UniProtKB/Swiss-Prot annotation:
Keyword list, A-Z: Aminopeptidase, Cytoplasm, Hydrolase, Manganese, Metal-binding, Protease
Top-rank EC class of the record's enzyme: hydrolase
UniProt gene name: pepA
Keyword rRNA processing listed: no
Protein name as annotated: Probable cytosol aminopeptidase
Active site as annotated: 276, 350
Molecular-function GO terms, alphabetical: manganese ion binding; metalloaminopeptidase activity
GO CC terms in record: cytoplasm
Keyword Cell wall biogenesis/degradation on entry: no
Residues bound to Mn(2+) 2: 264, 269, 287, 348
Top-level taxonomy: Bacteria, Pseudomonadati, Chlamydiota, Chlamydiia, Chlamydiales
Residues that bind Mn(2+) 1: 269, 346, 348
Amino acid sequence: MVLFHSQASCSKRVKADAIVLPFWKVKSKPKCAASIAKEYESLYRVALDSFSGERGEVEFIYNSGQGKEKRLLILGLGKNEELTSQDVLEVYAKVTRTLRKAKCTTVNVVLPTISELRIPVEDFLTNLTSGILSLNYNYPKYTKEAKKTDPLLTKVTVLGIVPKIADRIFRKEESIFEGVYLTRDLVNGNADEVTPEKLANIAKGLAKQFPSVDAKVLNKDAILKEKMGLLAAVAKGSAVDPRFIVLSYQGKPKSKDHTVLIGKGVTFDSGGLDLKPGKAMLTMKEDMAGAATVLGILSGVAALELPVNVTALIPATENAIDAASYKMGDVYVGMSGLSVEIGSTDAEGRLILADAITYALKYCKPTRIIDFATLTGAMVVSLGEDVAGFFSNNDVLAQDLFEASAETSESLWRLPLVEKYDKALHSDIADMKNIGSNRAGAITAALFLKRFLEDQPVAWAHLDIAGTAYREKDEDAYPKYASGFGVRCLIYYIEKFLSK
């Protein structure tokens, strides 16, 4: 994907469907933030009577002949001294939404005068690029009118910046968003198509695409041979066999530092015998968003050729309902040897993650483990769709993730591992139950996973993306439905804190 181009001189720009001109909000009237103003001043002068320059304000002006573009879009950036990187991300996402609705496919984007920017030009350009890329995406439609979807942008030329600075940022963000789009496509896909086998094939495809990536897939028999009794239990009710996927990237083979990413891969969650209500089941094709996220992250890391070692583990299965389904009140033993009494078959995600954690400890020699899962409704209630909660046993890892979230505007919030609540997992007949009480559900789910670390000195973080992985509205910097949340944050984290 090569969407972005740059041109230092505005006068040498190529023809396009539209040009985006930025404005600052000042006391008297909006001030054009770029030197190209004189060329279009006669066009936008009248529009300024009703245009304030507020952040995110946009207005189209049709060009009757002058200039190289059919339309001028004036964009408010708000007050210069108040503009943040997240603001840049969101306003250029809005620009993309506006351009696409107007059927524009080629666009010239004028940068504000660099010397006037209060934030580093690299940050501005990165977030401009990310905002445009995030909304330059179509989720799948199956109607006869699918072809009437707003067209994608095919060429974006950023004016006022030399290619030496811009092109490196463009290529990097395009590579990252290939991973974001992969994540979104998988989460948005039909559950009958995005099966455990499909996830395995995607992993194999990445291994073919990148020489430094290897894929290994365990089928049902291999899962049973490894004594992954918790993953096998969840899979019992499905006509589709489970898979356990191991995808390894070796960017620094001589280093012992090793990051293991684990993604929950429940490709459809009916709740099992503890059947979900129909409305709650409606979006459960997205219950494999954790798996899709780690595939997207690994794709981006490999594309950027980062000097790190990363392995993605994906326990993949449906949680379906059948006469053979695993049953509440029964006890199943995981790969760790720990036994679990099933308090709810709808708390299946933590079961398959537990076997993946054990696999990581046994075979991967991890320095750190980071898992992603659409795990609890409690997290959605707590933090909504804009913030993902996370838990960690390591303050350094937690702080680094928090910083990465701030830099990428993918908000994380650390929640406590309240040890007192661990007793809610007590079972009289097994080592533990898979659910706690009806309170602090996100915390007790994290405490359940923490037990499978078995006190080994491994840094660990658990990201509950139940609220952020899938959105019901097209707003801010995200399209409707699958968001791809977490891919950008983790790639930033890996690049900044681990690429040494």
